């Protein structure tokens, strides 16, 4: 039975592969509980955690609920949590033995009970090297004869264009493209979802959204922690694979795509693919690659101090990458993708700087900027000039500030995984990457990955807890960004998140 565009409203089950991992306890199960408590999941939902670790049932329940926060005085919330735990179970198995998947299918059937159809979502929070063996065994042993089957796959999908294509060639005979949901959790974040509405619901913004009005665009990811024991994994991934190729490129496409015919999943992704195919890197020698060293006070170690990192590694933990889009709308506008670990603060934001007024009447006016803060403290603010209050005629820089926590005090903003899991049950693929979209993203960064592998450039050092390499200022200046915020200007208040 085809699963295209069909919503799973009953007879639903979800298998969480990698259920013993940190992502499972920190994000996956809290998101599923939130949806369950709001009645957004199928009313008869069954959730099975699957991993290789030996975990007793009660220990598993304790593990998956330790990050779920409820009001202990709220009896209804406590009842919901207990009911949720009854819907969850654990099954231990390997990722390559058919008999373990046969056992999983029996476990699912037992949990599901007497159903006329079996609608199953298989969520793979696993290393890419086991995707194919898991998908193969699922197809043979666990895909129902009557019902819907969907494969939800966590990033990374490959490590470059070639590996992504090889992986897809092995998955394609097993699951149709309409059954594969490739997750980039940034597409579930509130402010990333909001980009489409911001651009296409507001004519005042739409009319300014091109090379005639915009001088530069920055997409910035800053994380305040380093690799902290994950250096072995990160060293093979690099900041380019870990953050730029997926999160930042996805944001770039939503910022720059043309108006889709409709907001159906394929129409939306068609436009993203079109703009990606016209996107290219700037000169490789203009790219800033950095690696953090110990903090100024010596309390935080450098990247090479991590025992899991290979000695002498030149893996970049920071990158600033210029991109250009060869379309009539965007030709000549630099898009600067900046990402780094062990930074001064944690934030993800989009900064659109507009060109100076052409009339020349106010030579001391400041540049307008539209800033979209993805996290923390979701916000949109527009930096603008007004007359300085009082008798002066001098321009004063201020902003129109839409900070969500102040404007929408009684409205819950759902976590990214909540939105994405809900879409997976609904059969909506618009916030999941299609294979040609992923291929374009890898094609974009592949020249940089090849340059890093072959030339092994020495990364610029920057202190743990700093704003990045010292050459960053000259990089931004070269690509037209103008620092002109006066000392008196106070940026909207922001807190620092612990993760991304």
Swiss-Prot record:
Gene Ontology cellular component terms for the protein in this record: cytosol
Binding, NADP(+) 1: 18-25, 52, 155
One Pfam family hit: G6PD_C
Domain of life: Eukaryota
Gene3D superfamilies per record: Dihydrodipicolinate Reductase, domain 2, NAD(P)-binding Rossmann-like Domain
Example GO molecular function: NADP binding
Pathway: Carbohydrate degradation; pentose phosphate pathway; D-ribulose 5-phosphate from D-glucose 6-phosphate (oxidative stage): step 1/3
Catalyzed reactions: D-glucose 6-phosphate + NADP(+) = 6-phospho-D-glucono-1,5-lactone + NADPH + H(+)
EC assignment: 1.1.1.49
Positions of D-glucose 6-phosphate binding: 155, 185-189, 223, 242, 341, 375
HAMAP family in the record: G6PD
Chain's role: Catalyzes the rate-limiting step of the oxidative pentose-phosphate pathway, which represents a route for the dissimilation of carbohydrates besides glycolysis. The main function of this enzyme is to provide reducing power (NADPH) and pentose phosphates for fatty acid and nucleic acid synthesis.
Similarity field: Belongs to the glucose-6-phosphate dehydrogenase family.
Protein name: Glucose-6-phosphate 1-dehydrogenase
Species of the source: Schizosaccharomyces pombe (strain 972 / ATCC 24843) (Fission yeast)
Gene: zwf1
């Amino acid at each position: 039975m085809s699963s295209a565009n069909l919503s799973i409203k009953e007879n639903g089950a979800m298998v969480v592969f990698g259920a013993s991992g940190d992502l499972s306890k920190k994000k996956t199960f809290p998101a599923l509980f939130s949806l369950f408590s709001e009645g957004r999941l199928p009313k008869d939902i069954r959730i099975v955690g699957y991993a290789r670790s030996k975990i007793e049932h009660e220990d598993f329940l304790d593990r998956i609920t330790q990050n779920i926060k409820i009001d202990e005085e709220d009896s209804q919330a406590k009842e919901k949590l207990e009911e949720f735990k009854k819907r969850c179970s654990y099954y231990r198995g390997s990722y390559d033995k058919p008999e373990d998947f046969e056992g999983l299918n029996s476990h699912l059937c037992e949990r599901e009970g007497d159903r006329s159809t079996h609608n199953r979502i298989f969520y793979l929070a696993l290393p890419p090297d086991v995707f194919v063996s898991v998908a193969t065994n699922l197809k043979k042993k666990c895909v129902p004869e009557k019902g819907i089957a969907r494969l939800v796959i966590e990033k990374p999908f490959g490590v470059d264009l070639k590996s992504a294509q090889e992986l897809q060639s092995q998955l394609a005979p097993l699951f149709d493209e309409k059954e594969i949901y490739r997750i980039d959790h940034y597409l579930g974040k509130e402010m990333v979802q909001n980009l489409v509405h911001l651009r296409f619901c507001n004519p005042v913004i739409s009319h300014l959204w091109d090379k005639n009005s915009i001088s530069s665009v920055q997409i910035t990811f800053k994380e305040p922690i380093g690799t902290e024991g994950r250096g072995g994994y990160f060293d093979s991934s690099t900041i380019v694979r870990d953050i730029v190729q997926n999160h930042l490129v996805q944001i770039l496409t939503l910022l720059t795509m043309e108006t889709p015919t409709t907001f159906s999943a394929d129409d939306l992704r068609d436009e993203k693919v079109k703009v990606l195919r016209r996107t290219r890197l700037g000169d490789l020698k203009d790219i800033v690659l950095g690696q953090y060293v110990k903090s100024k006070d010596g309390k935080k170690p450098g990247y090479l101090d991590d025992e899991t990192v290979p000695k002498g590694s030149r893996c970049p933990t920071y990158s600033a990458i210029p991109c250009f889009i060869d379309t009539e709308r965007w030709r000549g506008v630099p898009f600067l993708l900046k990402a780094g670990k062990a930074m001064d603060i944690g934030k993800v934001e989009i900064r659109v700087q507009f060109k100076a007024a052409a009339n020349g009447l106010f030579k001391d006016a400041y540049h307008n900027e539209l800033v979209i803060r993805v996290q923390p403290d979701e916000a949109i603010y527009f930096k603008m000039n007004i007359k300085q209050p009082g008798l002066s005629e001098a321009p004063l820089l201020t902003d129109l500030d839409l900070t969500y926590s102040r404007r929408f005090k009684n409205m819950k903003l759902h976590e990214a995984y909540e939105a994405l899991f809900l879409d997976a049950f609904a059969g909506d693929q618009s916030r999941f990457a299609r294979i040609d979209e992923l291929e374009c993203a890898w094609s974009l960064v592949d020249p940089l990955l090849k340059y890093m592998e072959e030339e092994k450039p020495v990364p610029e050092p920057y202190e743990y807890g700093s704003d990045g390499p010292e050459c960053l200022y000259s990089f931004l200046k070269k690509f037209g960004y103008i620092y002109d915020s006066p000392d008196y200007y106070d940026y909207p208040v922001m807190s620092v998140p612990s993760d991304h």
